[in-house]
Curated annotation (Swiss-Prot):
An aminoacyl-tRNA editing enzyme that deacylates mischarged D-aminoacyl-tRNAs. Also deacylates mischarged glycyl-tRNA(Ala), protecting cells against glycine mischarging by AlaRS. Acts via tRNA-based rather than protein-based catalysis; rejects L-amino acids rather than detecting D-amino acids in the active site. By recycling D-aminoacyl-tRNA to D-amino acids and free tRNA molecules, this enzyme counteracts the toxicity associated with the formation of D-aminoacyl-tRNA entities in vivo and helps enforce protein L-homochirality. This is D-aminoacyl-tRNA deacylase. A motif (Gly-cisPro motif, important for rejection of L-amino acids) lies at residues 137-138. It catalyses: glycyl-tRNA(Ala) + H2O = tRNA(Ala) + glycine + H(+); a D-aminoacyl-tRNA + H2O = a tRNA + a D-alpha-amino acid + H(+). It comes from the Bacteria. The keyword RNA-binding applies. The lineage of its organism: Bacteria, Pseudomonadati, Pseudomonadota, Gammaproteobacteria, Pseudomonadales. One of its GO terms (molecular function) is Ser(Gly)-tRNA(Ala) hydrolase activity. It comes from Pseudomonas aeruginosa (strain ATCC 15692 / DSM 22644 / CIP 104116 / JCM 14847 / LMG 12228 / 1C / PRS 101 / PAO1). One of its GO terms (cellular component) is cytoplasm. It is found in: Cytoplasm.
Length: 145
C-alpha cells in the first residue's frame, strides 16, 4: 500500500460538482492499493497516518501527529499511485490491485479510520474526482507498508 500524505490547511473532494468530503487543517492522503495488500496492511497504514509526526511543535519541529493536533483526515483512493513508472513513457498499472480488491482494502482502511478517529472524510472510490487543497508547507511524504 502506498499513501501520499499531504499536510493541508484545508482540502475537499468533489464528484460531479458535489462536495463529497472535506476537512480543515489536517492530512489529505491519496491511497494506492497493491495486489499483496490486505486488512493487516490497512491497519498498519492507519497507525502510521494517525501517528506520523508532520505537524510543528512550539519550536517549529515536526513533533506532532494528527492525533496530537486533532486535525481532519481526508482519505482518497488513487490507483495510479501503484503504477510502475520505471521504464518507458507510459505508466503500467499491472502493479495496482484489481478494482474489487482495491475497493475492499480501501473501504477497510476507511472503516478502521472511522472506528479509531472522529474526523474522517473520504472521496468516492472509482469516481472521477476533483481534489482541492491548500498544501501547508508544502509538506508531502510517500508512506509505504
Amino acid at each position: 500500500m502506498k499513501a501520499l500524505l499531504q499536510r493541508v490547511g484545508a482540502a475537499r473532494v468533489e464528484v460531479g460538482g458535489e462536495i463529497v468530503g472535506s476537512i480543515d487543517r489536517g492530512l489529505l492522503v491519496l491511497v494506492g492499493v497493491e495486489p499483496e495488500d490486505g486488512e493487516r496492511c490497512a491497519a498498519k497504514m492507519l497507525h502510521k497516518l494517525l501517528n506520523y509526526r508532520v505537524f510543528g511543535d512550539d519550536e517549529g519541529k515536526m513533533n506532532r501527529s494528527l492525533l496530537d493536533v486533532q486535525g481532519g483526515l481526508l482519505l482518497v483512493s488513487q490507483f495510479t499511485l501503484a503504477a510502475n513508472t520505471r521504464s518507458g513513457l507510459r505508466p503500467s498499472f499491472s502493479s495496482a490491485a484489481p478494482p474489487a480488491q482495491g475497493e475492499a482494502v480501501f473501504e477497510h482502511l476507511v472503516k478502521l479510520a472511522r472506528e479509531a478517529y472522529p474526523q474522517v472524510a473520504t472521496g468516492r472510490f472509482g469516481a472521477d474526482m476533483q481534489v482541492h487543497l491548500v498544501n501547508d508547507g508544502p509538506v508531502t511524504f510517500l508512506l509505504e507498508s
